[in-house]
Curated annotation (Swiss-Prot):
Keywords recorded for this protein, A-Z: Phosphoprotein, Transferase, Ubl conjugation pathway
Basic and acidic residues biased stretches: 21-34
Protein name: Probable E3 ubiquitin-protein ligase HECTD2
Protease in keyword set: no
PANTHER family the UniProt entry points to: HECT-TYPE E3 UBIQUITIN TRANSFERASE (PTHR45700:SF9), UBIQUITIN-PROTEIN LIGASE E3C (PTHR45700)
Organism from which the protein derives: Mus musculus (Mouse)
Length: 774
């Protein structure tokens, strides 16, 4: 199976299993029968605003198919809940009398939308060039005579064959490769860019031709010309208009039910689109899903019970686009462009439980396509799943206590940590080891010898102090790389890796308890953390091992990665000039040790022919093999807390955001959500403060956030989730601001001038670390 075909649903099992070609042949005729093309709002006189004429065309489509069923559909209520559906391949059968084997003609149009009859046009033997098309367009706009342009559109979109004749670079060539669709992309763009500005009769003719194409009989596997036709039609901007959604849905359905090999071709053709065109396809599909779920005018669509296949089909085509995007480096669009914020308003836990219960083989769930679910929605799923696990475990503890006729104790409902500040790491390790069965309970921390009830502040302080101590260079567990501004695992060998497990548990507890940590790991760390996303039942299975590239190494050790890239591009004799072998050296506790990258590596010279293998093995050694035991302990610690299928919904980048927060700052949002104690938001000192902060460069804004919260990143829920507070500090204005990071609180003296406030604030945030100046 190809890499592209496998990656249809990153972070989750494949959503739809493609049928084998042998099975497909027997099912083909039934699979391609189209459902009746009807719209619940196709009644005459339905007001669609400026798009009224296209709405009339939808009315024509309804008239041609089944008037009786359309009337029944209009009387049916529309439900937002998706009915049970197994998958795209198990779509409901279609009535035989709907299949029209004869082309629909202009005479079939109702009288109010008939267009003047045109002679049967035919495309010239030589395909039209962009210049030819633009000249025809200019003449039509100047003279008002659109006959030539109309003839081109009506013929080009008359069938899949004509589409290929019109848009292939060479009509006689096969172009049966994934690297080249064989289409004149400039002509496709020009034709579609002009389409919405042409007269309505031309636009109707194009839609009529698409219907004819989709209604044709298909026997046997698709040809590459058919795939090209689908690829062209997918780019049609008419499908932005809701009145065309019935036709668009049928197009998506046919693309979604193609076999895996055909999807493979489409994916590689899609990745060749321009960023603008690709983004338009994604946005069009997301809008289609959103409006089907929450239509502004429900009467414009068939009842949801009559088109249960619309959303699954669109989701599968979105999966093809997502796969194409992941194959391009850098991606055509950010992965966040696939998020559909509309899904934040559906019953996410119902979607999650459906996916948990039925997987990918029965009922449809958006969790089968996690790339469309926003990180905020995924956080809700993970939090609620965590809460349910916490409640379940706490309830079981209570039942066990009662069954033994022991008095229940409220403390049994929590993971209670009692630690000494002077022995923070060892005490924390001992407590977490002894209370391994309680890790999924709500965390509460007590510092020995100190009074105080943990309402969240002590827990956050425990995290901050522990992380700060473990990641200190003198502790030796992690190495800080200044060039990449991140930590990486020390490769030093030891007998006990329990402290690496502790760090993993800390990260898991942070996610589980919705706490943002000030940790800087490179992106490849989170990729390894999801390899695999669920702990394998076989304990001998390697964990934390993933495929790595020189780009991953660049995120950790940019200087070394640059040197290896220089080696790859070196034009001289590598063996004679570098005199290297497949052996590398590392310093451990002042002792230089050697490691062979492959058996007998110390005797294998690096040459021009094998240097790529050397770079790959060296990269794998640094990021996988040399730290395997350390990372395996870290992996097991994290998953001992976050053992949930919800992790399968996440990308590595999203795990990082859940652990560390987002780097995107919005200080205006922070201003809107800030609470005040002793000040009012209209006080002069507060107005000075925000004038200064909003005028800060990004670097100083990050320092302010780190000074007051312990991290320069923002929680998934945004600035509002920080619960930021500014309190009045009734001290001399000569004092610097003070921060209580455990409570995200800034104590501000009543400075009398903006200049004084700015000076004191910059000094305070620039010369503090972790907890501010107290």
């Amino acid at each position: 199976m190809s890499e592209a075909a496998r990656d249809l649903s990153p972070g989750a099992p494949p959503a739809v299993a493609a049928a084998a070609p042998e099975e497909r042949k027997g099912k083909e005729p039934e699979r391609e029968k189209l459902p009746p093309i009807v719209t619940a709002g196709a009644a005459a006189g339905l007001d669609r605003g400026s798009k009224g004429q296209i709405s009339t065309f939808s009315s024509f489509v309804s008239t041609v198919t089944q008037k009786k069923e359309a009337a029944e559909n209009r009387s049916s209520p529309t439900h937002l809940a998706l009915p049970n559906i197994r998958n795209v391949r198990d779509l409901p059968p279609i009535c035989l009398d709907v299949r029209q084997k004869q082309r629909m003609s202009v005479e079939a149009l109702p009288s109010e939308v008939k267009v003047p009859p045109l002679p049967e046009p035919s495309l010239p033997s030589q395909p039209k060039t962009v210049k030819d098309f633009e000249e025809d367009l200019e003449k039509a706009e100047a003279t008002g005579n659109w006959k030539t342009v109309h003839a081109f559109y009506i013929t080009a979109f008359d069938s899949f064959t004509e589409l290929n004749t019109a848009f292939k670079k060479d009509a006689t060539a096969s172009f049966n490769t994934i690297e080249d669709s064989g289409l004149n992309a400039n002509l496709v763009n020009a034709v579609f860019d002009a389409l919405l500005n042409t007269p309505q009769d031309i636009q109707k003719s194009v839609l009529k031709g698409i219907i004819n194409s989709l209604l044709q009989e298909w026997k046997g596997p698709r040809t590459k010309d058919d795939l090209r036709a689908y690829f062209i039609l997918l780019q049609n901007p008419q499908f932005n208009i809701t009145s065309t959604y019935v036709i668009y849905a049928h197009l998506l359905r046919q693309i979604a039910t193609l076999v895996e090999a055909d999807h493979h071709f489409l994916v590689h053709w899609l990745k060749k689109l321009s960023q603008k065109k690709f983004k338009q396809l994604v946005e069009r599909l997301l809008q289609f899903v959103s409006l089907r779920l929450f239509p502004a005018k429900p009467e414009e669509f068939p009842p949801l019970t009559k088109c249960t296949w619309w959303i699954p089909s669109a989701a599968k085509v979105l999966a093809l686009l997502n796969t194409a995007n992941n194959l391009v480096h850098p991606p055509l669009v950010p992965y966040t462009d696939f998020y559909n914020s509309t899904l934040d308003h559906i019953d996410l836990m119902e979607e999650y439980h459906t996916w948990q219960s039925f997987g990918n083989s029965h009922r449809f769930s958006f969790c089968q396509y996690p790339f469309v679910i926003s990180i905020a929605a995924k956080k809700i799923i993970i939090q609620r799943d965590s809460e349910q696990q916490m409640i379940s475990i706490a309830r079981q503890s209570l039942v066990d206590k009662v069954s033994r006729r022991q008095r229940p104790d409220m403390n049994m409902l929590f993971l209670n940590m009692k630690v000494r500040r002077t022995h923070l790491v060892s005490d924390s390790l001992d407590e977490l080891t002894r209370k391994r069965a309680d890790l999924k309970k709500k965390l509460k921390v007590t510092f020995v010898g100190e009074a105080g009830l943990d309402m969240g502040g002590l827990t956050k302080e425990w995290f901050l102090l522990l992380i700060r101590q473990i990641f200190h260079p003198d502790y030796g567990m992690f190495t800080y790389h200044k060039d990449s501004h991140c930590h990486w695992f020390s490769s030093f060998k030891c007998d006990n890796y329990s402290e690496f497990r502790l760090v993993g548990i800390l990260m898991g507890l942070a996610v589980y308890n919705s706490i943002t940590l000030d940790i800087r790991f490179p992106p490849c760390c989170y990729k390894k953390l999801l390899s695999p996303p669920v702990v394998p039942s076989d304990q001998s299975t390697p964990v934390g091992i993933c495929s790595v590239t020189i780009d991953d190494l660049c995120q950790v050790m940019p200087e070394l990665a640059h040197g290896l890239k220089e080696l790859l591009s070196y034009e001289g004799n590598v063996e004679e000039d570098f005199y290297s072998t497949f052996q590398v050296f590392q310093e451990e506790f002042g002792v230089i040790k050697s490691y062979n990258l492959k058996p007998g590596g110390d005797k294998i010279p690096v040459t021009n022919q094998n240097r790529r293998e050397y770079v790959q093995l060296y990269t794998d050694f640094l990021l996988n093999k040399s730290i395997y035991k350390q990372f395996a302990a870290f992996y097991c610690g994290f998953h001992s807390v976050c053992a949930s299928n919800a992790l399968m919904l996440l990308r590595p980048e999203e795990v990082e955001i859940l652990v560390c927060g987002s780097p995107e700052l919005d200080m205006h949002a922070l201003q809107r959500s800030t609470q005040y104690d002793g000040y009012a938001k209209t006080d002069l000192t507060i107005r000075y403060f925000w004038d200064v902060v909003l005028g800060f460069p990004l670097e100083l804004q990050k320092k302010l956030l780190h000074f007051t919260t312990g991290s320069d990143r923002v929680p998934v829920g945004g600035m509002a989730d920080l619960n930021f507070k500014i309190s009045k500090n009734e001290t001399s204005t000569n004092w610097l601001p003070v921060a209580h990071t455990c409570f995200n609180q800034l104590c501000l003296p009543p400075y009398k001038s903006k200049k004084d406030l700015k000076q004191k604030l910059i000094i305070g945030i620039s010369n503090s670390e972790g907890f501010g100046l107290e």
